[in-house]
């Protein structure tokens, strides 16, 4: 996904086994440098970890005056040769 005249977003893939604190650090790092990031998750467990990570990352970037918004959408991904529907969470600075 690209914005108007913007380069493609950096994509972070989250699994059910991902640690939210680690993902939050990655999200905060990309947000600080690029102002936006896409988080992809397939399955309820992965979506849960991704949402927790986004909430944690808000706490990491808020002290420097950055407020995050999250825009969810569906995405079709190919995983091991199979089409899967996942969730795309676009995280941007408001």
Question: What do these predicted ranges mean?
Answer:
Residues 18-20, 45, 76:
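Residues that cap or initiate secondary-structure elements
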Residues 30-48:
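Short glycine-rich, basic-tinged beta-strand/loop micro-motifs
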Residues 44-68:
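Short, hydrophobic/π-rich interface segment
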Residues 62-94:
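C-terminal edge-of-domain segments
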């Amino acid at each position: 996904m690209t914005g108007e005249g913007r380069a493609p977003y950096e994509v972070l893939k989250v699994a059910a086994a991902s640690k939210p604190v680690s993902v939050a650090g990655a999200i905060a790092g990309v947000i600080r440098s690029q102002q936006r990031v896409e988080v992809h998750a397939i399955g309820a467990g992965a979506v849960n970890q991704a949402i927790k990570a986004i909430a944690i990352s808000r706490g990491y970037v808020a002290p420097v005056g950055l407020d995050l918004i999250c825009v969810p959408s569906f995405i079709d991904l190919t995983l091991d040769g199979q089409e899967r529907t996942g969730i795309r969470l676009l995280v941007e600075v408001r």
